[in-house]
Each structure stands twice: as structure tokens, then as C-alpha cells.
Amino acid sequence: MRSIVKRILVTCAATTALALLLTMVLCALGNAMAPKWQVEPFTDHITLTTTNTAIQAVDPATGAVLKTPQEGAYRTKETHITVALDGGKTVNAIVREPLDAPADRPACLFLHGSGTGKSSEAFGDVANAMASAGITTLVPDKRLDNYTMLHRDYVSSAHDYAKSLEILRKWPGVSRSETGIYAESEGTWIATVLTQQHPDLAFAILTSPPVVSGRQQMTLAATNYLTAAGAPDAVKQLIPRITSLGTQRMGLAYADFDAAKYRRSLTMPLLINYGVKDTAMPVEQGARLLIKAANQAGNTNVTLRYYDANHQLRTGSNQTVPGLPLEPHYTHDLEDWINAVTSGTGANGWATPMIAGTQPNQTVTAPLKTPPALVKSMGVIVGAIAVC
């Protein structure tokens, strides 16, 4: 009997010791798998002096406000064209131009974000409004045969957009030296490649730009989404474990697009626009990074506007849904800014503040570095699951 009890006690002791050892190993492994960084609060807020987003320049000849064509000044004409790309590919495009406007006028090429692709379904209201203020616009289709959820090549996309840029620069009535670009969201990454390749662009407008890499932006967006959904902190703390994992083996190399490298090419007059209801973008941090990069490149002609609007600068919902109206001042501000900078307005030539609008409130910081822990690749996890 004693021997049986003894064996039971020994077995229990061994089992307990083994359980403790396994617990310690699993705890150590869990700690090793956790990145040494977390999402931090954002505190470097931008202070605005006025909620008025109006943009006006000073006429150097008179000292008064520069008079430029206003929205609705011209009737517009729409022309559907085909743009030839490399490899025998083509995309459709729409040119909108002001009728009876003076020659040598400004022009603007539009670059799609991730949510749009067809020229017939995107930017129609913005592009037509610009045209009515004397600015010729070109909206091409996004090339989609090499654009998927797993593969996106922003450098190649910039090369494709350059074909449309050349057509626009040669369009009748357009001044080549007064032609610039307008990009939204994901398209702003492509825009910075285009500004590097074409530093002679007259201007660049970046609306709702992520600024940081896709991996870094997604960390911020996921944190804000889970916070809004009421997720506990323990769940939100899992985000760095996921977003730090390498994705190249799965084809998601574009998540690590070198945004910092390309934003140094913003040497031309720059307009940055954000909707303060956009929680997916680093609305204050991104603006500071862009202004810093432009300034370091010798460009101080940077205007920043914040609107009481969503990611698409539309009102009526914080979410991106079809059919919403644009923020009522938005297109007017775009046109006034383009007409001013193409008239020669420099950093010291503005009659209105260079930073204005609705006060933003970015709550968390998009991490600028996301080093992984022990497990470095999403492919390792996928492979382990497959084996199991």
C-alpha cells in the first residue's frame, strides 16, 4: 500500500514539475514572439488658428487678393480617349476642359486610390468642378491587369500614369509648365513616385495620404477600428504581433513600400487635404511628415487643409459609401489653390493661413518601425497551420 501511495506521489510531483516547466517554456516562447513595440498615443497635435479653409493669394502687382477664375466660370466639355500603355495595353480616360477659356491654362491629372478604378465612376464631380474654373483635367482608368490584393507595383503604376500625364501636357490649350497631379489615398504613394520621376510637375495635391508604409498605416487603422468597436486592450495588443510579420512570401511586398524615400521628392507646391473623421489615416502625423520632407527638400510652399469630412472628403457619413456629397468648400479650395500656384504664388504669397480647417485629433501614432519578434513571417504561421 505504501509503495502505491509513494508511486502516486512521485507521479504527481513529476507531472506538476513537467507542467510548471511547460508553462515556463510557453510563457518564454510567448514573450519571445511578442514584438518589443506597441502602438503609442499620438501627442504632437497641430494647432489651427482658423476654421475657414478658404485659400487666397496676394496679387504682387496690386497687393490685393489675386483674382482667379471661380467654379462655374466656364461651361465644360468632356472627351473620352484611350491611353496607350507599354506592352500593348490600353486604358480609357476622360478629359474635361473649360470652353472658351484662355490658352496656356493649368491642367491636373488624377490618380486613383484603392477604392476606385474606372474613369467613368471616379472623380467626376471634382474634375468637372476644376474644369469649370479654367483647369483642364484628365482622369484615366486604373490599370487593373497587374493590380490585385496580393500584388501592387507602385513604381510600375507611376510609369502608367506618366503616359496620361504626357497626353495632358500636350492637350490643346494646356500649359505644359502648369500641369500637376491630384491623388487620393493609396494613389498618393504612386504620386510621390511620379514626383520623383517628373520633378518639373507644377504642383501636387495629396488627399487623405497614408504617408507611412502600408504596414505602418494598417497598424494605426486596425487599432482605431478595434477601439471604436470596443475591443479590450488585450485584443488590441495583438495587432503588433500581426502587422510586424513579413508578407513578401505571400506576395504582399507593397505593404513595405518605401514611402519615406519617395516623399523627399515633393519639391513642387504641395497641398495636403484630410478629413478629420478619417480614422484610417495618420491625419496629423502624416501632415507633419510631409511638411518636414518637403521643407528638407527646400520646399516651404506647403498648404494644409482639414475638413469636417470622411476619408473621401465627403459628408453625411464617417464611412466611405457611394453617393455622398463632397464637403461644400473642398473643390473651391482646390481650384483657388491650383490657379494661384500656377500663377506663380510662392510660400510668402498667401493671403490666407497655410494651415487651417477643422481641428483634427489623431489619437494613436502610426509606428515608423515595426520589427518582428521570434516569428518573422506570416508564411511561417500559415505553413505551421497547414502542417497541423
Residue spans of the language-model regions?
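Short, surface-exposed "cap/lid" segments of acyl-processing enzymes
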Residues: 92, 99-130
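Short beta-strand/loop motif that positions the catalytic acidic residue
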Residues: 266, 272-274, 278
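Alpha/beta-hydrolase active-site loop
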Residues: 151-172
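Conserved alpha/beta-hydrolase
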Residues: 127-147
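N-terminal cap/lid segment of alpha/beta-hydrolase-fold proteins
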Residues: 44-103
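Primarily recognizes the serine-hydrolase "nucleophile elbow" in alpha/beta-hydrolase
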Residues: 167-226
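Conserved alpha/beta-hydrolase "acid-adjacent" motif
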Residues: 279-286
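Alpha/beta-hydrolase-fold serine-hydrolase catalytic core, especially in secreted/extracellular enzymes
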Residues: 6, 300, 309-312, 316-388
